[in-house]
A protein has these predicted regions:
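Long, charge-rich, low-complexity alpha-helical segments
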Residues: 26-69
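A short, structured beta-strand/loop element
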Residues: 2-42
Length: 69
């Protein structure tokens, strides 16, 4: 499983402290919502500058980690 901590951070100064992909203002929540709505990974990558292929599995790993706790 991918180590989501390499790609995701929380900072109270960025997006009200929601988990975001490092160096961006793209929230994990946003990506997970789009995936749940059926948006393809490639569409997300094409439409959101700063989003990289490794961010998709990192978002899923983060969600799995949160659900385990």
């Amino acid at each position: 499983m991918i180590d989501w901590k390499q790609y995701i951070e929380r900072d109270p100064q960025v997006m009200l402290g929601k988990p975001v992909f490092k160096g961006t203002r793209i929230t994990v929540e946003f990506v997970l919502e789009r995936l749940a709505q059926g948006t393809g990974s490639q569409d997300l990558l094409n439409n959101y500058q700063g989003l990289y292929p490794e961010h998709i599995p990192a978002a899923l790993a983060y969600a799995a980690s949160v659900l385990k706790s």
